[in-house]
Amino acid sequence: CALLTHFKLSQLTQQGSMPANPVVVTTEVTTGILTRIARHFGVQIVNNLLVGFKYHADVIWQLESTGRYEDVTGTPDDLILASEESHGIMAMPGVRDKDSAVAVLLLAELALTCKRQGRTVVDYLNDLSRQFGYFKNGLENLVMTGIEGKQNMARMLDGLRANPPKAIAGMAVASFEDLRDESGRMGPFKGDTDKAARNFLIFRVAGPNGIAGKVCLRPSGTEPKAKAYVEVSGPPRPVTMTDDAWSKQIAEIDGMAAALGKEFVASAMAFAK
């Protein structure tokens, strides 16, 4: 999604055909590099949706109905690209769900452009990391089957909700957000389905040298497990940084992401017992 978002924005910029109020749409658990890319191009971004393309489609519907979604303004034609972490892409407002056909066409155009420039798609992705910072994303599955598993999962989420950790893997928890908090940004529940979807916890952590991380935890909507989405990111590469130093920073971020996921799962499972 980072590749296609940047590619489409760069092409529209080069062609002088950017819409009047361009907007990128994504979820809370999708890579944060999208936010940096959108801000680089000066476009609006919705980056805090729940998981599921019905939420992306709702943004388009709100723009269509009222011309606004929260602080974002525009029309459906202003959509640049909507995405989620499972590689779903929506790039046309008329198709309000995952659209693999358009995603393949965009990727093919990107690959052709890279080939003409003597580069590969991997080169393009590495360039994004250098320009916007390296992001390491991972997923931890906490499988809990049967009635007992469902009860354990509820205990785990309620335990973390009541007693959020102060630090994870040596990184201080800078903020904690419970999307079931009706005094928070999502407001009162709209119904039972909304309440279930908002069983979602967000832990943001701060590391050294501009490195930051995030863990999001939610029950799966289709399988007997909880999902912990882990992200650790660093700053853009300074022009004076050597290749060795850059490689070392990437390895450091990879290691921090692995440790963050491992320790978070251990602390979460302690509440499930």
Q: How would you label these PLM feature ranges?
A:
Residues 1-11:
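Catalytic or ion-translocation cores adjacent to nucleophile or general acid/base/metal-coordination motifs
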Residues 11-218, 225-229, 235-241, 246-273:
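Phosphate-binding and adjacent anionic-ligand microenvironments
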